[in-house]
Amino acid sequence: MPLQPSRTSTGLPLVIDNTFGTPYLIRPIEHGADIVVHSATKFIGGHGTTLGGIIVDSGKFDWKASGKFGNIADPNPSYHGVSFADAAGPAAFVTYIRAILLRDTGATISPFNAFLLLQGTETLSLRIERHVENSKKVVEFLANHPQVEKVNHPSLPDHPDHALYEKYFPNGGASIFTFNIKGGREEAFKFIDNLKVFSLLANVADVKSLVIHPASTTHSQLNDEELAEQQIYQNTIRLSIGTEHIDDIIADLEAGFAAVRGE
């Protein structure tokens, strides 16, 4: 089943953010995507040390058909009337980005940052395998823990996207997920405050295991009703599972639960 809706009905390219999926676990273009974007700061770089992004163009989208993309399809006066769609063909979109957007905004990654991201790709498959393996064990641990109300992970049979997860992610995935601890905000804070291996940080997809309380940080501008619409509650905790030894990760989580119990 392709991801792509009918192009004739929308006239728009299908753009997929594959930051969390990574090219190692899923390649959206093979499923009908026209353009794929990544925040390379996450899994591709792997260590949270630099900022960068990637755009991958399938070259399959017709930028002239709908008449909606004059900046790419029509003659461009700043390039002597050249139409990027005609001159660059399948590379029209990425050529437009390089020739126009980079020219106008000056967004240029430094050589050292580029080096860090390229270096990260050398260990991408190795790291993702470990992220996935650790995540499976953490999900199992949490799903069977008496102090956990709910685990939100597509690998679990009761998750609404479980069938899609099994179809598109046969090698696993989703090392960033949330769970609801039994109790409320106080229990969530106590749990987080007593973790040692997990770092309390807002970023994700790092070799380091990370934890945060979304309701008071990333989504703090929302009221309780708006939070609930996003399935975020005062007892919701977000985890980003790293590549540490699984025994250390599980022991750290259990220490957090023990602190909530007053032990």
Task: List where the protein language model places each region.
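Active-site beta-loop-alpha junctions enriched in small/polar residues
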Residues: T19-G21, L156, K182, G242-E244
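Short hydrophobic/aromatic beta-strand micro-patches
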Residues: V56, T178-N180, S240-G242
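Conserved PLP-enzyme active-site core in the AAT-like
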Residues: M1-H145, N152
